From Swiss-Prot:
It comes from Lodderomyces elongisporus (strain ATCC 11503 / CBS 2605 / JCM 1781 / NBRC 1676 / NRRL YB-4239) (Yeast). GO terms for molecular function: ribose-5-phosphate isomerase activity. Its EC number is 5.3.1.6. It catalyses: aldehydo-D-ribose 5-phosphate = D-ribulose 5-phosphate. The gene is RKI1. This is Ribose-5-phosphate isomerase. One of its GO terms (biological process) is pyridoxine biosynthetic process. Pathway: Carbohydrate degradation; pentose phosphate pathway; D-ribose 5-phosphate from D-ribulose 5-phosphate (non-oxidative stage): step 1/1. Keywords: Cytoplasm, Isomerase. Gene3D superfamilies: 3.30.70.260, 3.40.50.1360. One of its GO terms (cellular component) is cytoplasm.
């Protein structure tokens, strides 16, 4: 019945050629497709709002990160009539291409070490605006740009919301390491409490480990639920061979989420110690 309500114009033809199982699969795919369309539209809306509400009118240097939602950030910035008045600093290869593809001027952080504002994505966000980043293996340059910025704005979809870091992001904390040290660091990380540590592989695209833009390796260390991200980050940074970690603490000003409903939720870190649901309620 649901199938016939969704596609009444195809009722006779499709019922003739598809079994009930095929019909159910088609409906499931259609619902999933519509859901993903809503999410994608919300991501775009979140990115546009983030730019419109936060970009200083006289900004001269803008940081642009990576991620599926940041694509829309670059798109929105590329629509600005004064885009020739500022330069954009990338956090890696993908964001460099986003800058170029949207007709923006590409700058280097060596030439522009002070950045007015940066926009980036995240793999997971808790209510205190702590982040896990580095799923795209760009964490060091992302943190460099973020730390050089007067303001960091994060854009993502609702699936990145979490009560605690490590609750939804199960791949572990990304850690950029000097290649020669990775074996020793695996042992060090386990001694610090990591349940598992994996050297990230290139998969089908590359035989062997992932190589970062800085010619380093990425270790993914699963610490489970992370109650104190700042403390863990400081412990990890003390290990010889660690370049930086994917734990971003005390650096984010605001987060824009594209919701499944097609709406946008914002977190600003004002509500402390609340559950994700309470923060969402406060934000709407």
């Amino acid at each position: 019945m649901l199938f016939h309500r969704i596609l009444p114009q195809y009722k006779t033809a499709i019922s003739t050629y598809l079994t009930p199982t095929h019909c159910r699969l088609y409906i499931a795919n259609l619902v999933t497709s519509r859901r993903m369309t809503n999410i994608e539209a919300a991501k775009k809306l979140a990115a546009y709002r983030a730019v419109d509400e936060n970009l200083p009118p006289h900004a001269k240097v803008i940081g642009i990160g990576s991620g599926s939602t940041v694509v829309y950030v670059a798109e929105r910035i590329g629509q600005l009539p004064n885009k020739d008045d500022f330069v954009c600093i990338s956090t890696g290869f993908q964001s460099k291409q986003l800058i170029i593809d949207n007709g923006l001027k590409l700058g280097q952080i060596e030439q522009h070490p002070s950045i007015d504002i940066a926009f980036d994505g995240a793999d997971e966000v808790d209510p205190q605006l702590n982040l896990i980043k580095g799923g795209g293996a760009c964490l060091f340059q992302e943190k460099l740009v973020a730390s050089a910025s007067d303001k960091l704005i994060i854009v993502a979809d609702f699936r990145k919301q979490s009560k605690h870091l490590g609750q939804n992001w199960r791949q572990g904390v990304p850690i950029e390491v000097v290649p020669i040290a990775f074996t020793k660091l695996i042992n060090d990380l386990k001694r610090l409490g990591a349940k598992s540590v994996d050297l990230r592989q290139g998969g089908k695209a590359k035989a062997g480990p992932v190589i970062t833009d800085n010619n380093n390796f990425i270790l993914d260390a699963d610490f489970g639920i992370i109650e104190d991200p700042k403390s863990l980050h400081l412990q990890l940074k003390q290990l010889v061979g660690v370049v930086d970690t994917g734990l971003f603490t005390g650096i984010t000003e605001k987060v824009y989420f594209g919701e499944e409903s097609g709406e946008v939720t914002t977190w600003d870190g004002v509500v402390t110690g609340s559950t994700t649901e309470e923060v969402i309620a406060e934000s709407k």
